[in-house]
UniProtKB/Swiss-Prot annotation:
Subunit relationships: Homomultimer; when bound to the RRE. Multimeric assembly is essential for activity and may involve XPO1. Binds to human KPNB1, XPO1, TNPO1, RANBP5 and IPO7. Interacts with the viral Integrase. Interacts with human KHDRBS1. Interacts with human NAP1; this interaction decreases Rev multimerization and stimulates its activity. Interacts with human DEAD-box helicases DDX3 and DDX24; these interactions may serve for viral RNA export to the cytoplasm and packaging, respectively.
Subcellular location: Host nucleus, Host nucleolus; Host cytoplasm
Residue ranges, compositional bias (Polar residues): 90-106
Chain intervals for the UniProt region annotation (Homomultimerization): 19-27
One Gene Ontology biological process: mRNA transport
Sites of Phosphoserine modification: 5
Family according to the record: Belongs to the HIV-1 REV protein family.
Keywords annotated in UniProt: AIDS, Host cytoplasm, Host nucleus, Host-virus interaction, Methylation, mRNA transport, Phosphoprotein, RNA-binding, Transport
SS bonds (residue pairs): none
Note: HIV-1 lineages are divided in three main groups, M (for Major), O (for Outlier), and N (for New, or Non-M, Non-O). The vast majority of strains found worldwide belong to the group M. Group O seems to be endemic to and largely confined to Cameroon and neighboring countries in West Central Africa, where these viruses represent a small minority of HIV-1 strains. The group N is represented by a limited number of isolates from Cameroonian persons. The group M is further subdivided in 9 clades or subtypes (A to D, F to H, J and K).
Organism for this UniProt entry: Simian immunodeficiency virus (isolate CPZ GAB1) (SIV-cpz)
Protein name: Protein Rev
Post-translational modification: Asymmetrically arginine dimethylated at one site by host PRMT6. Methylation impairs the RNA-binding activity and export of viral RNA from the nucleus to the cytoplasm. Phosphorylated by protein kinase CK2. Presence of, and maybe binding to the N-terminus of the regulatory beta subunit of CK2 is necessary for CK2-mediated Rev's phosphorylation.
Domain of life where this protein originates: Viruses
Length: 124
């Protein structure tokens, strides 16, 4: 199962999945009966229980499989290496562009600003 060779790992995984399934089945979605306030309160309590079940499920997986449910810390690049430049733009910030703007297909847009949302060939 899932590329493992040891049957005891598979049995442990199946046991963990069965426990998690029972947890989620024990908390069905609330019924749509009653006043708006009562329904809202039932949904709020249901979401709180779902959150608890999710946390318990993570602990069950960690216990049965021997690994944490979330990956470790990610290494992020240094802040000075990050930029907000557009990949398509080759022009530096602060320089003026005297040529006419182009569309994604490479066509130039007239200076009057006839920007068509529908594109070429579409009837307005």
């Amino acid at each position: 199962m899932a590329g493992r060779s040891e049957p005891q790992d598979d049995a442990r995984l199946l046991q963990a999945v069965k426990i998690i399934k029972i947890l989620y089945q024990s908390n069905p979605y609330p019924s749509p009966e009653g006043t708006r306030k009562a329904r809202r309160n039932r949904r709020r309590r249901w979401r709180a229980r779902q959150k608890q079940i999710s946390e318990i499920s993570g602990r069950v997986l960690a216990t049965y499989l021997g690994r944490p449910p979330k990956p470790g810390d990610l290494e992020l690049p240094e802040l000075d290496k990050l930029s907000l430049q557009c990949v398509e733009t080759t022009q530096d910030v602060g320089t003026s562009n005297t040529s006419q703007p182009q569309t994604a297909t490479g066509e130039t847009v007239p200076a009057g600003g006839n920007y068509s949302i529908l594109g070429k060939g579409a009837k307005n």
